[in-house]
Amino acid sequence: MPRTILTYGTFDLFHIGHLRILERARALGDRLVVAVSTDSFNALKGKKSVIPFEHRRDIVAALRCVDLVIPEESWEQKVDDIRNHDVQVFAMGDDWEGRFDFLAEHCEVRYLARTPEISSTVIRTDLEPERRDHLAAVTREVKG
């Protein structure tokens, strides 16, 4: 029986940290199922993605280490996903350490090391001054 791993994420502004954690998760078993947060679920969490769900889903699905992509539409779906996909290991980045321990009654729970110094938040923060400068230049141009 294949050992199935399940992980969740938004995967906005896809970067090497995303790839590495998905590769680490896949190395735990034979099959990796990835739940990508939908735009509507992100809105409920107070987050807005730069890249729309359909594109993020397709990017993740194109990776060699990923076997199946499903939508993440609620906090409550995790137990059903574990059951529906016959999951043996639930894996998340160590920034979520302890938050999913309650799933241990359904499968093994693992927290994986993240790639240091890279995150979508860091990328957004680094791009913000450029965005503001560009917006100011466009505004000046329009006002003439």
Which stretches of residues belong to each language-model region?
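Nucleotidyltransferase catalytic core that binds NTPs
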Residues: 1-144
